[in-house]
């Protein structure tokens, strides 16, 4: 593949990963919060229509990713770990045509705040299992497992968000 040196390089809008030397719980939560912020940043300046636009053949859009991450925050931390009754979310359901960037991001931020309450309340017991698992026939995971899993889940989808945003308007960066 030949590189076009005449085209200007896209401007990068990077958020830098946190740099701290802290205990395990603080480090894990700080990295999770960093990734959550990266996902939200990918919606900045987009119209609702663009954010709903599928960027790949699977139909995934930036707003779908935000909705999905909202659901997994609530499902893992509140439903599975703490045992709350949260309304299930169907990954296969199409995005409603009237969803907005502002509304979706607000719902995600609210889910993050609720999840963080659970995370902070369990800081002293990282190995204590939660109430149940989202995985059939699996033991309830510990908070340590949940934090690592959510870093992986959110990081994977932050990468998807990077690509979707670049496909929409050429924006690059974390």
Task: Locate the predicted segments by residue.
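Acidic/histidine-rich alpha-helical segments that form the ligand environment
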Residues: 94-131, 142-151
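Active-site rim elements
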Residues: 22-28, 101-102
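Short, contiguous alpha-helical
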Residues: 2-17, 25-44, 48-92, 132-174
């Amino acid at each position: 593949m030949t590189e076009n040196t005449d085209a200007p390089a896209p401007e990068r809008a990077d958020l830098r990963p946190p740099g701290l030397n802290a205990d395990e719980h603080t480090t894990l939560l700080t990295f999770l919060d960093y990734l959550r912020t990266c996902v939200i940043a990918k919606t900045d300046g987009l119209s609702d229509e663009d954010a709903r636009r599928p960027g790949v053949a699977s139909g995934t859009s930036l707003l779908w990713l935000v909705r999905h991450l909202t659901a997994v925050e609530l499902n893992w931390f509140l439903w599975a770990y703490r045992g709350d009754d949260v309304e299930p979310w169907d990954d296969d359901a199409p995005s409603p045509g009237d969803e907005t960037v502002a509304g979706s991001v607000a719902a995600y931020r609210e889910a993050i705040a609720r999840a963080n309450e659970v995370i902070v309340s369990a800081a002293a017991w990282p190995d204590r299992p939660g109430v149940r698992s989202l995985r059939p026939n699996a033991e309830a995971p510990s908070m340590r497992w949940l934090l690592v899993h959510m870093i992986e889940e959110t990081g994977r989808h932050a990468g998807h968000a990077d690509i979707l945003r670049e496909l929409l308007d050429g924006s690059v960066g974390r």
